[in-house]
Every structure is written in C-alpha cells, then in structure tokens.
C-alpha cells in the first residue's frame, strides 16, 4: 500500500520504477485513490483525514496516476478498485477495536483518541462502501518503445 504522495513520485517525477524495470518488467501497486472530482476538492482544502490522520496527505485519482507515467515507458496494464472489499475490512477492524477498548485504554490511549479512531474507521468504511474513496490495485509494465 503506497503512501498518499508516493505514486506520483515513484512513477513519474523520480522515474524510479521506470529505471528499475527491464523492458517487459511489471510493477504492482496498491493505492488509495479518489475520483477526479474528489481529488480536486482535496487539493483545494484539507478534509478531516488530511487534518488529523495524514497531515499533508493527498490521495491521487487514477487519472493523476496515469498522467504521472505519461513521460515514462510505463504502461497501465490493469487497475482494479477493491474498495468495496476494503470497506468490509475496515468494518471488521472497527468492530475489533470497539470489542477491545479495555486493552486500548490499558495502553494509555484516552477517550479523545478512541473517538477519533472509531470515527476514522467508520468514515473510511463509508467512503469505500460508497465509492467516494477507492482502493486500486494497479499493474504497470515497462514498454519497449521510446518515450516521446
């Protein structure tokens, strides 16, 4: 799973993946994404998660990832949104978290942390279940052609 800022750096600006792969080589990446409209809204102002959980984070859209590989020899071979399944994972994490609050408190976490973490897990679950937030598994392949 990639850090929110990592795809553009790994795939485009730094050229690290393009340089590391041989022609025909494949690279797989799992990354949380947003539809283009939500991506643009994130860029204009911080949402709750950007403020409290991942300060400065910016999840890309699939189009942003595609643009980041435009001047490389990388080709997008597959992109699957597994967000609906990830929503179920988040629900299980939240239920497990709530079932173990005594252990959480015993580790020194206060009620503010507990409320924030429960809200974060529920917010993410809802986002993935509705498609507002996506979780893409992407496969890229290094082509044999010349970059334009």
Label each region the model flagged.
Residues 1-9:
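A short SAM/SAH-binding and catalytic strip from SAM-dependent methyltransferases
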């Amino acid at each position: 799973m990639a850090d929110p800022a990592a795809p553009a750096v790994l795939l485009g600006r730094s050229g690290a993946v393009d340089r590391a792969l041989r022609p025909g080589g494949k690279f797989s990446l799992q990354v949380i994404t947003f539809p283009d409209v939500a991506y643009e809204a994130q860029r204009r102002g911080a949402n709750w998660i950007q403020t409290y959980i991942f300060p400065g984070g910016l999840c890309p859209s699939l189009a942003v990832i595609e643009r980041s590989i435009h001047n490389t020899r990388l080709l997008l071979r597959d992109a699957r949104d597994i967000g609906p399944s990830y929503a179920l994972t988040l629900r299980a994490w939240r239920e497990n978290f709530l079932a173990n609050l005594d252990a959480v408190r015993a580790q020194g976490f206060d009620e503010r942390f507990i409320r924030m973490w429960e809200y974060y897990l529920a917010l993410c679950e809802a986002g993935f279940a509705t498609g507002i937030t996506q979780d893409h598994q992407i496969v890229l392949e290094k082509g044999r052609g010349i970059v334009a």
